[in-house]
C-alpha cells in the first residue's frame, strides 16, 4: 500500500477526550477497501509534531467494541502516512499489582477475541510474527515520558461489549502473568 499523503507519522486511537490535545486540526475523510473508519481522521499538532487522531468508537460512540472497524481504521491511518499507532485505553487490573490510576506499558498480550478479523491476509500462505506485539522503542519513550510508570505486563483483550465474568477474570489472573490487565 502506498501512502496518499504524509500528513502525520504518529496516530492516537483513543476516546473522544483526546481531540483536545491537538492544535490546528483538520479532518480527513478516508475510504478504505474495508469500508469507512470509525470517524474522519483528525490531523493536528502536538508540541510541533503532526499527529493523527481517530476515535476508536466513532465521534459519537457509534461502535460497540466488537463492531469497531479495526481494519478500516488502520488502513485509513496508514494511507495518511502514519507509521506508529498509540492506543491508550482504560483497563481493569487482574491482581493487586495494578491499582486504579496506575499507568502500565504492557509488553505482551493475549488475544481472546473471536469475532473480529485479526489480519488483512485473506488468501495465500502468510505467517505473521507476533511474539513481541509492542514496539520496544515506543514503549521506552512512553515509559520515559512520565513518572511512576509500570513496565511490562500482559494485556488480556476480550471481545466485548460485555466485561468478563468473575470466573473469567479469576482464570486470567491465575495464569501468573505479572501486571495482568484486561481490556475490551
Segments the model singles out, each with a brief description of its role:
Residues 133-174:
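Active-site rim beta-loop-alpha module in soluble metabolic enzymes
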Residues 176-178:
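Alpha-to-beta junction loops
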Residues 2-130:
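Metabolite-binding pocket within alpha/beta catalytic cores that recognizes anionic/polar moieties
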